Structures are given as C-alpha cells and as structure tokens.
Amino acid sequence: MTHSLRVIFAGTPEFAAAALAAIHEAGFPVPLVLTQPDRPAGRGMKLQASAVKRYAFERGMAVAQPPSLRRAGKYPAEAVAALDLLHATPHDVMVVAAYGLLLPQEVLELPRHGCINIHASLLPRWRGAAPIHRAIEAGDAETGVTLMQMDAGLDTGAMLHEARVAIAPDDTTATLHDKLAAAGARLVVDALVELERTGALAATPQPADGVTYAEKIGKHEAALDWRKPAAALARQVRAFDPFPGGAGTLDGATLKLWAADAVPGRDDAAPGTIVDIGPDGVVIACGEGALRVTQLQKPGGKRLPAREFLAGAPLAVGQRFAPADAA
C-alpha cells in the first residue's frame, strides 16, 4: 500500500531506525532523512554511521547530517544549508525520534502538520534523555511510548497517542528498548494513517502533575553502593545494561557486574562482602538483603556467566568490594 503523506524523518539510534523502517515499509514517502554526523566508535574509534543513516542509505533515501539546525549556533553555515534543504523539500509532517539535536522554532513550524515526536515513556513521567533507563532504575511496573506534537519545551508537547508496555522483572534497558522501539514504530504508523485520513490528530495537553525528568546517564553511575538495598542494586544493574553497566572495585580491580537479582542476606556481613560463591553466582551482602551476581567481567575481559568467570578469576568468601565513595 502506498500513501500520499510525505514524511521527513529525523532520528539517530536503533530506536529511531525501527520507526523509520516501519514508516518506509508502510508505504509513506520519505523525501529526506536527518540524522547526526558520523561519530568515532568502537575500539578503533573509527567513524561510524548512525543506525538511521545505514537504513536510509541502503534504501536510497536522501540523507542530511547537519551538526546543528540553529542559525546562530556553533555551526551557522551548516545549519543554514540544512534549513534551506528543509524549506526546499516538499513534505507534510516531520517525525522525530531520538534525533539528538535541538529543533528551532523555525523547524517546528515548517511542516504543514508540525513535528511529531516518538518518546519512550508515558509522558509526563520521564521527560528527557534516558527514559528507559530511569524507568527500570525506579522500579516502575510499566512504561510505554508517547507520540506528542513538539513544541519549544523539553518533551512538553501535547500528547497524540500512547502505547503502554509492561516492564518484566528481568528486563534490561536493552530488552525494554527493543519492546518500546517496536511499540513506537507501530504507534507512529497508525498515527500517520489517521493523519492522512482525517487531516488532524486529537491533541491532549500533558497534565501538570506527575512530571519527572530522566537525566542523561553518566559513566560514574556504574558504581554500586553496597549500602543500598539489594533490590535497588539489582534494578541499577538491569537499568545500566548495556551502558554503563554495574561496577564494583575488588582488591583494586574494577569488575563489571552485568546480571543480578536480590536474595536474602546475612545480618552479620558488612555491605560489599562476598558471603557465598556457587555455580549460580556470587552473593554479595548489601544494606538490605544480598545481591546474587550471575554475570561478571574483569578488566579487559569478556562478559561471562559466573561459573566461567570464576574458573579464570577465582573469588573467595570474605572478600569485600570497596565502598562506592572509596572506589
């Protein structure tokens, strides 16, 4: 099936690529794709294209990669060129998903139907850069995807559609990301079909209550504070998989702790102390309960199940991970 609604797409990572693929496969014309410039990545720090760029290039779509869209910003010449291209490209609506660049008011007002953002939370909860991580870290039972009509604020636009997604007890950011990406892809296609058919989408202002912000994830957040309850640390480990992981310092070496669950603890063990070692994992005392770690990684090594890790790097009951503020 083909459609007449012309969609400019702006996005960068895999989450956005899923939406672009769904829009393209549904038959909507995509005359232009915006994505961030290639970035150094991997051990060799070679320039790598974004997931959105790779998808668009493979299908012969026009791609632009401006470092900014702000005329008065750091890259005015590149911004002007990109804005001129947007003005010259006939389109009806812009779909934005994890693009990573600020859209100035000029861009927000350019499409006939405005700019629609795909946001990975149930707004107004978890506005901001890391909604998937923060939902898991906070212990939310569910999250979802919200389509909103973009305005000048940070994820403050009126809500158009939403899809709810349960957070499973073993969900990591990686697994929940994939669920939300699929939900967002379906949601935006349904919205575009409706927009084409009716000429408008019903918009509901976000409620003033329940606003929370999902701050960007920093590498320093990997450190586990063993004084916290084990349940909170288990959520932290899941929330920060694949980045930045959970981390603990043992005898001067930083170990990555990748998969973990909360188990009953011992009252006589100081937080951070290894209280049990077995084929199912390494059990570490916490401020409340204990954390059973089932996947570990030593510096320069690979992520391994506990049994394989212990075969090459034996640990002992009684060893103690350093406090987070002393690591």
Swiss-Prot record:
Its EC number is 2.1.2.9. GO terms for cellular component: cytosol. (6S)-5,6,7,8-tetrahydrofolate binds at S121, L122, L123, P124. It is an enzyme of class 2 (transferase). Gene3D superfamilies: Formyl transferase, C-terminal domain (3.10.25.10), Formyl transferase, N-terminal domain (3.40.50.170). Keywords: Protein biosynthesis, Transferase. It catalyses: L-methionyl-tRNA(fMet) + (6R)-10-formyltetrahydrofolate = N-formyl-L-methionyl-tRNA(fMet) + (6S)-5,6,7,8-tetrahydrofolate + H(+). Pfam families: Formyl_trans_C, Formyl_trans_N. Attaches a formyl group to the free amino group of methionyl-tRNA(fMet). The formyl group appears to play a dual role in the initiator identity of N-formylmethionyl-tRNA by promoting its recognition by IF2 and preventing the misappropriation of this tRNA by the elongation apparatus. This is Methionyl-tRNA formyltransferase. It comes from Burkholderia pseudomallei (strain 1710b). The lineage of its organism: Bacteria, Pseudomonadati, Pseudomonadota, Betaproteobacteria, Burkholderiales. The gene is fmt.
